[in-house]
Regions:
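A short acidic-to-branched-hydrophobic micro-motif
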Residues: 94-128
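Sec-dependent bacterial lipoprotein signal peptides
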Residues: 1-20
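N-terminal targeting sequences that direct proteins away from the cytosol to non-cytosolic compartments
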Residues: 19-100, 125-151
Length: 151
């Protein structure tokens, strides 16, 4: 009887704090975000074995393209490589020829590469380890006037 009573008390304490429930919900949300990123049009597509080879071929192709396409992003004009767009769901660069997402993303939250337009901060992030992505990112950074603000 005492064991059951203690079990009930412990369960009530766990349920009343909601910590474990919130932890499970957060884990599910994080897992879903990671899975969305690894889809073909997500910024993490290169991590998916199914798309890895195609993503690297797309990167090699995009490196050769000029960075001259003007697009609107959250109230400002950005210049990105030809035949690419910013994926409206993940804000990552998307190749229109192949449909592959690249590990280059844009944000309205301050990161290290920032550009301020009319008091609003825009950020650029790209995978600096991947050689082709690093080249594309540096071109976008230079053309759009992003500045490195981290120390």
């Amino acid at each position: 009887m005492m064991r059951r009573l203690m079990t009930i008390v412990i369960m009530l304490l766990m349920l009343s704090s909601c910590y474990y429930f919130n932890q499970v919900v957060d884990d599910i949300r994080d897992s879903n975000a990671m899975e969305r990123g690894r889809k073909k049009d997500g910024g993490g597509a290169y991590e998916n074995d199914k798309y890895k080879e195609g993503v690297y071929k797309a990167i090699d192709d995009i490196v050769k393209r000029p960075v001259n396409k003007k697009i609107q992003f959250e109230g400002t004009e950005l210049i990105i490589p030809e035949n690419t767009v910013i994926n409206p769901d993940s804000w990552t660069l998307l190749d229109l020829k192949t449909g592959y997402g690249l590990p280059i993303s844009f944000s309205t939250q301050g990161l290290c590469l920032n550009k301020t337009v009319k008091g609003k901060v825009y950020s650029l992030w790209y995978n600096k380890v991947m050689s082709g992505v690093n080249e594309i990112g540096k071109k976008i950074e230079k053309v759009n006037g992003f500045t490195y603000t981290c120390k």
